[in-house]
Amino acid sequence: MSQYEKLLLSILSGTKDKGVLFADLRAVLDRLGFQCRIKGDHFIYTKDGVEEIINIQPVGNKAKPYQVKQVRNIILKYQLGGDLHEV
């Protein structure tokens, strides 16, 4: 299992929302094909075919837990995680 798959699995499992590094969350969104634009410390992600806009901000080097949950819900809703979305 690759590092990306392990990271995606930990996000989808929902057991470590407080421990997800901001850079890791960004890497997952980039790998899933989201486009990023940055305004200050706001990282705004969009993707064709996905209605929602994802807006994330770092707290130190971590991602905010509620934003990790929002990303997880979008991945599950649109089945973006490949075979891993069935966690």
Regions found by a protein language model. Give the residues of each.
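Basic nucleic-acid-binding interfaces
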Residues: S2-K39, D48-V87
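Major-groove recognition helix of helix-turn-helix-like DNA-binding domains
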Residues: H42-I44
